[in-house]
């Protein structure tokens, strides 16, 4: 909506009223003017007209179509964009289908045909041409078309141009200097270059809008040309014989010149009398009220009705004193002295050329000088304070209307005075006997000091405002300098901030570099510590290796024990069954090097004093034990009635089964079958995952080899027990777990172990000991 939406709605309702008998062209033209001058937006106007077109009343629809036709023809491109589109064309087609009124249908067809012809060269309005062709194909009969109906001559206001400087004076826009657009040309101007207001009839703008100086001159030039043609003389005067007469004034003879001189003398006489009266009045006023203001104009000027009155009695005494006064005014030295005194007086006076037009009565050339010089001496007696009175009154709230009234009264008095004198001159009357001329002269003479005061006030005001302009210019320069200083200060602050930021970045970079160096040093120290720890660990490992080597050398130098496993004994259970120890057993006063296995020759080297052998087998005297040979124990055989444990109670399936047999007697060993049960030394072996080959019951040679380092290293358990190559299997060897039957209590059996049957050698008979070897 626009600012004139209410007016537009009212005019649209009036133009489309169902009570109309004919088209209301006045309202339609006003609607067009509202749209053209921008008071109503084109989109809003077209939508409102569409609503009227779709009204059920055919009269309203017909008048709305008339309004739409006029708007399209007169309002330019903005309305064309709203009407010549697909939506509007579809709405008109739908209205044509459902409308039964013939006049409305014909009007719709007429408009579509006219718009299609008018917009035939506009590509963006091609939808109108397409709609027209489609409707022709559909069989609609269009009315007779005249090309004059499609003539659109609508000028619209140009689009506004945006810029940062004035189009005329090139002043940059800012906070104080604002942008203004000319409604006639669309350019952008400052306030000084676009201070004029004018109507633009060619754009339909009937109200005064802002225009630039060139457009204002162009528009007003046309208006003045039209006005001059209208203010010419009427044709009746031109055809009359009066116009054929010469308009030049008649030549004056000596008599006329003499009368004019007498008139000037009479004016001077009346002026002197008026000055004298004014002087006396001011003296009485100043003595009573020293600071009183001068009397207003109404008291000094006679009423308008008395200007043309001719009181004979008042003019008679003035005529009697003509001769002495006339002699005084003819004295040139007197007036020259008055002029010199007026020049020396401090009171400013009006310039002579300004007073000449008011006092000049006619075409005389000599008398105006004396008339202009007459009021000058009288200004000497006037004080300076009254001169500033009107100006102070004006500053205290006196409006300009009083000055306008004063000037109008003075102008009327002067014009009346001049006309009266001309009339007297034309009739040949003497002006000295005309009381109206004298009264007018007196009133004009009274107004003259006030006119001088007004001129002084205007001069003072001009000086005052010039001073203000100078101060404004100084303020403007100061603001410019201040703005420059502020900009320079901001630039300095920005540079300082940038420098501080750069220094901060440099410091941060230095700190980061120092921290990186410290980190590298810390990592280097950590690496050195780690290397040192590794070296210490390596030294400890070397020391342990040296200790192991020394231990091995000491073992190699020491004699071998006859029974290396003498301290490893297993206590028999109550049933007399011997169990193999399930794990290594620690004994006091022993030394076990790292990596040694319990049961090896290295294990238990530094044992305390060996306990005496409790077994029934004495050690071999005077011989050196072979490290590859392990002392054999003779296990007593069990009772004859003892049987092997059932297979259900067997241990791991990989272990050899128990087999009860009679060991064959071996030379050099005694049978202990008849001895009482006693604790036998248990044989501690390292855990093995494979079957261990035991020595069979065949006789073996008991020759011992010397105890050397090579045999000791071969006897160490450092090799993997799971390798079968290191566990040689001796053919004919019979593994033997002896079942022992104690003398007291029922016979018990050892846990049976799965054992393959012997492959070589017949089983031995009798209760004999068996030699068992452990590698």
Curated annotation (Swiss-Prot):
A Gene Ontology BP annotation from the UniProt entry? protein transport
Modified sites of kind Phosphotyrosine: 216, 308, 329, 334
Q: Where is this region: Interaction with SNX1?
A: 225-541
Q: Where is this region: Interaction with SNAP25 and TRAK2?
A: 443-541
- PTM N6-succinyllysine: at which residues? 549
Modified how = Phosphorylated on Tyr-334. This phosphorylation occurs in response to EGF. A minor site of phosphorylation on Tyr-329 is detected. Protein phosphorylation may also be triggered in response to IL-2, GM-CSF and HGF. Ubiquitinated by ITCH.
Residue spans annotated as Zn fingers (FYVE-type) read 160-220
> Which residues are reported to carry the modification N6-acetyllysine?
207
Where Zn(2+) 1 binds, per the record, is at 166, 169, 190, 193
- What membrane topology term does the record carry? Peripheral membrane protein
Where do Polar residues bias regions lie?
Answer: 307-316, 658-690
Please tell me in which tissues this protein is expressed: Ubiquitous expression in adult and fetal tissues with higher expression in testis.
Subcellular localization, as worded in the UniProt entry: Cytoplasm; Early endosome membrane; Endosome, Multivesicular body membrane
| Annotated keywords | Acetylation, Cytoplasm, Endosome, Membrane, Metal-binding, Phosphoprotein, Protein transport, Transport, Ubl conjugation, Zinc, Zinc-finger
Q: What happens when the gene is disrupted?
A: Mice show a defect in ventral folding morphogenesis, exhibiting two bilateral heart tubes and absence of foregut, and died around embryonic day 11. Significantly enlarged endosomes were also detected in cells of the endoderm.
Boundaries of each VHS domain copy?
15-143
According to the UniProt record, what happens if one changes residue 329 to F?
No change in the phosphorylation level. Loss of protein phosphorylation
Q: Which GO terms describe its cellular component?
A: cytoplasm; early endosome membrane; multivesicular body membrane
Q: What residues bind Zn(2+) 2, as annotated?
A: 182, 185, 212, 215
Biased composition range(s): Pro residues: 744-761
List, as start-end ranges, the regions of compositional bias called Low complexity.
640-657
Domain observations? Has a double-sided UIM that can bind 2 ubiquitin molecules, one on each side of the helix. The FYVE-type zinc finger domain mediates interactions with phosphatidylinositol 3-phosphate in membranes of early endosomes and penetrates bilayers. The FYVE domain insertion into PtdIns(3)P-enriched membranes is substantially increased in acidic conditions.
Q: What does this protein do?
A: Involved in intracellular signal transduction mediated by cytokines and growth factors. When associated with STAM, it suppresses DNA signaling upon stimulation by IL-2 and GM-CSF. Could be a direct effector of PI3-kinase in vesicular pathway via early endosomes and may regulate trafficking to early and late endosomes by recruiting clathrin. May concentrate ubiquitinated receptors within clathrin-coated regions. Involved in down-regulation of receptor tyrosine kinase via multivesicular body (MVBs) when complexed with STAM (ESCRT-0 complex).
According to the record's subunit comment, the protein's assembly and interactions are:
Component of the ESCRT-0 complex composed of STAM or STAM2 and HGS. Part of a complex at least composed of HSG, STAM2 (or probably STAM) and EPS15. Interacts with STAM. Interacts with STAM2. Interacts with EPS15; the interaction is direct, calcium-dependent and inhibited by SNAP25. Identified in a complex with STAM and LITAF. Found in a complex with STAM and E3 ligase ITCH and DTX3L. Interacts with E3 ligase DTX3L; the interaction brings together STAM and HSG, promotes their recruitment to early endosomes and decreases STAM and HGS ubiquitination by ITCH.
Name under which the protein is recorded: Hepatocyte growth factor-regulated tyrosine kinase substrate
* Species this chain originates from: Mus musculus (Mouse)
List the taxonomic lineage.
Eukaryota, Metazoa, Chordata, Craniata, Vertebrata
Q: Which gene encodes it?
A: Hgs
């Amino acid at each position: 909506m626009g600012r004139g939406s209410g007016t537009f709605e009212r005019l649209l309702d009036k133009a489309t009223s169902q009570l109309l008998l004919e088209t209301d062209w006045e309202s339609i033209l006003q609607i067009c003017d509202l749209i053209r001058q921008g008071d109503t937006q084109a989109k809003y106007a077209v939508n409102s007209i569409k609503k009227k077109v779709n009204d059920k009343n055919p009269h309203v629809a017909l008048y709305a179509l008339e309004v739409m036709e006029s708007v399209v023809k007169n309002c330019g491109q903005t309305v064309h964009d709203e009407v010549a589109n697909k939506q509007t064309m579809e709405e008109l087609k739908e209205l044509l289908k459902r409308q039964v009124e013939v006049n409305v249908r014909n009007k719709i067809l007429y408009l579509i045909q006219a718009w299609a012809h008018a917009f035939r060269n506009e590509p963006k309005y091609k939808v109108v041409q397409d709609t027209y062709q489609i409707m022709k194909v559909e069989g609609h009969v269009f009315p007779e078309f005249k090309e004059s109906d499609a003539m659109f001559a609508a000028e619209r206001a140009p689009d506004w141009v945006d810029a940062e400087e004035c189009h005329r004076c090139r002043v940059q826009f800012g906070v104080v200097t604002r942008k203004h657009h000319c409604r006639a040309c669309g350019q952008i101007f400052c306030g000084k270059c676009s201070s004029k207001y004018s109507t633009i009839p060619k754009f339909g703008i009937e109200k005064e809008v802002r225009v630039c100086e060139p457009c204002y001159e162009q528009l007003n030039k046309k208006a003045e040309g039209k006005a001059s043609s209208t203010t010419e003389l009427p044709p009746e005067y031109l055809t009359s014989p009066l116009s054929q007469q010469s308009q030049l004034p008649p030549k004056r003879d000596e008599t006329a010149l003499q009368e004019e001189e007498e008139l000037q003398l009479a004016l001077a006489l009346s002026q002197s009398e008026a000055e004298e009266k004014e002087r006396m009045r001011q003296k009485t006023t100043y003595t009573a009220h020293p600071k009183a203001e001068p009397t207003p104009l109404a008291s000094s000027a006679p009423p308008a009705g008395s200007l043309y009155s001719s009181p004979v009695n008042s003019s008679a005494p003035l005529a009697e004193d003509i001769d002495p006064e006339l002699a005084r005014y003819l004295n040139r030295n007197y007036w020259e002295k008055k002029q010199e005194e007026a020049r020396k007086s401090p009171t400013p006076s009006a310039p002579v050329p300004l007073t000449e037009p008011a006092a000049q009565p006619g075409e005389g050339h000599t008398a105006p000088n004396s008339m202009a010089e007459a009021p000058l001496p009288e200004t000497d007696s006037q004080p300076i304070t009254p001169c500033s009175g009107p100006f102070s009154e004006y500053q205290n709230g006196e409006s300009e209307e009083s000055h306008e009234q004063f000037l109008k009264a003075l102008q009327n008095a002067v014009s009346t005075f001049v006309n009266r004198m001309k009339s007297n001159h034309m009739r040949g009357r003497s002006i000295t006997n005309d009381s109206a001329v004298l009264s007018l002269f007196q009133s004009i003479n009274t107004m003259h000091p006030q006119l001088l005061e007004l001129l002084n006030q205007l001069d003072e005001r001009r000086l005052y405002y010039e001073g203000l302009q100078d101060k404004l210019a100084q303020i403007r320069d100061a603001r410019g300098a201040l703005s420059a200083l502020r900009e320079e200060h901001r630039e300095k602050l920005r540079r300082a901030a940038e420098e501080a930021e750069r220094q901060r970045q440099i410091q941060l970079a230095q700190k980061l570099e120092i921290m990186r160096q410290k980190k590298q040093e810390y990592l280097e120290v950590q690496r050195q510590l780690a290397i040192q720890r590794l070296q210490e660990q390596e030294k400890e490992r070397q020391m342990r290796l040296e200790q192991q080597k020394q231990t091995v050398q000491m073992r190699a130098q020491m004699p071998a024990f006859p029974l290396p496993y003498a301290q490893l004994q297993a206590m028999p259970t109550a049933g007399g069954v011997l169990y193999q120890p399930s794990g290594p057993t620690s004994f006091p006063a022993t030394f076990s090097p790292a990596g040694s296995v319990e049961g090896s020759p290295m294990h238990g080297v530094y044992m305390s004093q060996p306990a005496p052998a409790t077994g029934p087998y004495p050690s071999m005297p005077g011989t050196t034990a072979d490290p590859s040979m392990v002392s054999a124990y003779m296990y007593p055989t069990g009772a004859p009635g003892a049987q092997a444990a059932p297979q259900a109670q067997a241990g791991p399936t990989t272990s050899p089964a128990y087999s009860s047999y009679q060991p064959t007697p071996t030379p050099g060993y005694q049978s202990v079958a008849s001895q009482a049960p006693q604790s036998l030394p248990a044989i501690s072996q390292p855990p093995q995952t494979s079957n261990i080959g035991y020595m069979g019951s065949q006789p073996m040679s008991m020759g011992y080899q010397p105890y050397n380092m090579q045999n000791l290293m071969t006897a160490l358990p450092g090799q993997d027990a799971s390798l079968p190559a290191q566990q040689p299997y001796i053919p004919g060897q019979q593994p033997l777990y002896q079942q022992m039957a104690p003398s007291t209590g029922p016979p018990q059996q050892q846990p049976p172990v799965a054992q393959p049957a012997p492959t070589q050698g017949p089983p031995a008979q009798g209760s004999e000991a068996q030699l068992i070897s452990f590698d």
